[in-house]
Structure formats: structure tokens, C-alpha cells
Amino acid sequence: MAGPLRAPLLLLAILAVALALSPAAGASPGRTPRLLGGPMDASVEEEGVRRALDFAVSEYNKASNDMYHSRALQVVRARKQIVAGVNYFLDVEMGRTTCTKNQPNLDNCPFHEQPHLKRKAFCSFQIYSVPWQGIMTLSKSTCQDA
């Protein structure tokens, strides 16, 4: 009688161990488990995120026909994904500055306050970086007026 029960009990034990070790087992209620290799939240203070943001803003300004530079007003969300390099996903509120494009230093440019010159945009940037090879590319960029 012990023989016929052994196989189902063994399968049940294997299933219990597999469930206990699955990524979903450690997830908090109401939160989806983080996938290995999937995007994860990143801090704007991280050096890689800062470099990706600077690169995205530079590319945004190169592609813009505006006579004024724009810069980040606020980083709404920053995520990163480790692949053969790093994908950065940045949601950024951009603002038009008082500096024209022939002025090189964008860091200290104030934002326009005059209503007819003030302009904001909400942008989502995807930047691919391979830091050890010095590679950084803007994979995707979408913006809409805010």
C-alpha cells in the first residue's frame, strides 16, 4: 500500500519546492515580481543615469529646430535594464531655456518665464549604453507638448 502513495507524494513535494523557489514566491502582495533581465527602477543620482540623461538632452537639442536650448526640468521616472550593455528608460519633463543654440554651456541657463516664450514638453527617451566601449545611442525618443 505504501508503494502507490509514494509517487504522488513525491510529485507533490517537488511541486511545493518549485513553487517556494519561484520568483513569485518572494513578491509582496499587490506587486508584480521583477523579472530577471527586465527593467528596474534607477536613481537619477546614478552616474550612468546622469550620463544617459545628458546624452538624451543633447540629442533632443540637436534634433530640435528651436533657436533656444531645452534642458530637463524634472526626471519623472528612470529605469534601467542590463543587457549586453545597459538600456536606460527616462521619462523627462523638458523646458525651454533662455540660452540660444550658439551658447555652449547649458547647465546654468535659466528657463523662460515669459508666457509667449515658455515651452514645456514631456519626453520618453530610451538610451543604449556600453560604457566599457564608449558607446551611447538614442534608441527611441518621443515627445509631446506639456
From Swiss-Prot:
Keywords: Amyloid, Disulfide bond, Phosphoprotein, Protease inhibitor, Secreted, Signal, Thiol protease inhibitor. Gene3D superfamilies: 3.10.450.10. SUPFAM superfamilies: Cystatin/monellin (SSF54403). GO terms for cellular component: cytoplasm; extracellular space; vesicle. Disulfide bonds join C99-C109, C123-C143. PROSITE patterns: CYSTATIN. Its main location: secreted. Pfam families: Cystatin. GO terms for molecular function: cysteine-type endopeptidase inhibitor activity. It is found in: Secreted. Residues 1-26 form the signal peptide. Belongs to the cystatin family. As an inhibitor of cysteine proteinases, this protein is thought to serve an important physiological role as a local regulator of this enzyme activity. This is Cystatin-C. It comes from Saimiri sciureus (Common squirrel monkey).
